[in-house]
């Protein structure tokens, strides 16, 4: 008898090697922060206005050196009738760190172009913009929003307000059902 041949089972087809993982998508580039060149801003305020602004500026000087910290700039801007967001204030300051906000100081001459830049910004919301924004919360379509819901929105969304600020803003605005006529509310806010 002939010797048995080793019958080998055909080798199982090797599984195809997994395709290499695709290269990770490059991280999206951060949008370049627009720098505001304060030296290029033309001061359009009258001498009298500048004197009034300086007087207000100096009220915030805590050390008597005719300077304020960067963290006070937003307060002074708002005291002078502008209404910049915190982001706009940081942008006009050159996006300083939190440490710099409390440590760095500026003089009135450095502040004035910042005030002019903020004053020139025409991106402020209009009455219609605010009413339209609040209409989203008008579930019944009757011109009112729930006071509790508005409190929550003001304290948690966008430029968050402190609870005391919300209460001061909403004082006397709610009806007996806890609802607020948002058109009257916007008129009230814009008159402050």
From Swiss-Prot:
The modification N,N,N-trimethylalanine is found at residue 2. The keyword Signal does not apply. Isoform MLC3 is acetylated at position 2. The modification Phosphothreonine is found at residues 69, 85. SUPFAM superfamilies: EF-hand. Residues 48-83, 125-160, 160-192 form the EF-hand domain. Residues 1-34 are annotated as: Disordered. The keyword Phosphoprotein applies. The modification Phosphoserine is found at residues 71, 97. Residues 17-29 have a biased composition (Pro residues). One of its GO terms (molecular function) is calcium ion binding. GO terms for cellular component: contractile muscle fiber; myosin II complex. Transmembrane segments: none annotated. Myosin is a hexamer of 2 heavy chains and 4 light chains. Does not bind calcium. This is Myosin light chain 1/3, skeletal muscle isoform. It comes from Oryctolagus cuniculus (Rabbit).
């Amino acid at each position: 008898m002939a010797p048995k041949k080793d019958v080998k089972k055909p080798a199982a087809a090797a599984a195809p090697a997994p395709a290499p993982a695709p290269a990770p998508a490059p991280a999206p580039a951060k949008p370049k922060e627009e720098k505001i060149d304060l030296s290029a801003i033309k001061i359009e305020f009258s001498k009298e206005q500048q004197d009034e602004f300086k007087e207000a500026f100096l009220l915030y000087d805590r050390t008597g050196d005719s300077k304020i910290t960067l963290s006070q700039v937003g307060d002074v801007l708002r005291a002078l009738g502008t209404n910049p967001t915190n982001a706009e204030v940081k942008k006009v300051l050159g996006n300083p760190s939190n440490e710099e906000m409390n440590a760095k100081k500026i003089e009135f001459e450095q502040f004035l172009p910042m005030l002019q830049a903020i004053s020139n910004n025409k991106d402020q919301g209009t009455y219609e913009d605010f009413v339209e924004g609040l209409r989203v919360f008008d579930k019944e379509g009757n011109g009112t929003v729930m006071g509790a819901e508005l409190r929550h929105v003001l304290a948690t969304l966008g430029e968050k307000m402190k609870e005391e600020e919300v209460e001061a803003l909403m004082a006397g605005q709610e009806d007996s059902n806890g609802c607020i006529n948002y058109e009257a509310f916007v008129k009230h806010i814009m008159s402050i």
